UniProtKB/Swiss-Prot annotation:
A Gene Ontology term for the protein's cellular component: extracellular region
Domain notes for this protein: The cysteine framework is IX (C-C-C-C-C-C).
Official protein name in the record: Conotoxin Cal9.2c
Tissue: Expressed by the venom duct.
Cleaved propeptide residues: 1-6
Chief site of localization: secreted
Disulfide bond in keyword set: yes
Keyword DNA damage attached: no
Functional description taken from the UniProt entry: Probable neurotoxin with unknown target. Possibly targets ion channels.
Amino acid sequence: KKGVTLREDDRFPCNAGNCACLPLDSYSYTCQSPTSSTANCEGNECRSEADW
């Protein structure tokens, strides 16, 4: 998994179909499959492009 930094233009940082997870120990979003566990994500949440 590649980390993605928060960009100032605030575009969705992941490919379509993936979701953005903000790990509890990081300030950079990571992209993961929507079926992945969100246990390590802030708010137990992985945000899809629709939620972005």
